[in-house]
């Protein structure tokens, strides 16, 4: 009798276990794919996704200028200051400035300067 009760108990346990497993799979509990936990997940924090920090931008502009010259820059014929660009003939502050044929003036040398104007006597302050 005890042996038959054990066999019956084991058979009932297997029957209930099988029924619960099939019910979980049929009704779609967590992990079975019916979307029951789509919004909360299993709350273990082991999700997946795609992340990208690329960004871009652009802009548009519109404006009007004061067209001077013949299309090559400000002033004729080819840029700021004739004939070839910034401060003819060779660049800013010719002959040794920016764009000079062999570079700027060596260190320690002073560029040529205008002589100082004579000092004017200062007028006495009025009372």
Curated annotation (Swiss-Prot):
Keywords annotated in UniProt: Signal
InterPro entries: SGP
Signal peptide: 1-25
Function (record text): Structural protein of the sulfur globules, which are intracellular globules that serve for sulfur storage in purple sulfur bacteria.
Family stated for the protein in its record: To C.vinosum CV2 and T.roseopersicina TR0.
Subunit architecture: The protein envelope of the sulfur globules is composed of the three different proteins CV1, CV2 and CV3.
Name of the protein in question: Sulfur globule protein CV1
Organism: Allochromatium vinosum (strain ATCC 17899 / DSM 180 / NBRC 103801 / NCIMB 10441 / D)
């Amino acid at each position: 009798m005890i042996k038959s009760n054990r066999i019956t108990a084991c058979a009932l346990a297997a029957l209930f276990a099988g029924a619960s497993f099939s019910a979980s799979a049929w009704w779609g509990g967590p992990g079975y794919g019916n979307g029951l936990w789509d919004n909360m997940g299993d709350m273990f924090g082991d999700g997946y996704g795609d992340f990208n920090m690329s960004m871009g931008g652009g802009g548009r502009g519109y404006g009007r200028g004061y067209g001077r010259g013949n299309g090559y820059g400000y002033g004729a014929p080819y840029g700021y200051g004739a004939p070839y660009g910034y401060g003819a003939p060779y660049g800013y502050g010719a002959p040794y400035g920016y764009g000079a044929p062999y570079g700027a003036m060596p260190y320690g040398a002073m560029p040529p300067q205008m002589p100082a104007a004579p000092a004017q006597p200062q007028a006495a302050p009025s009372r």
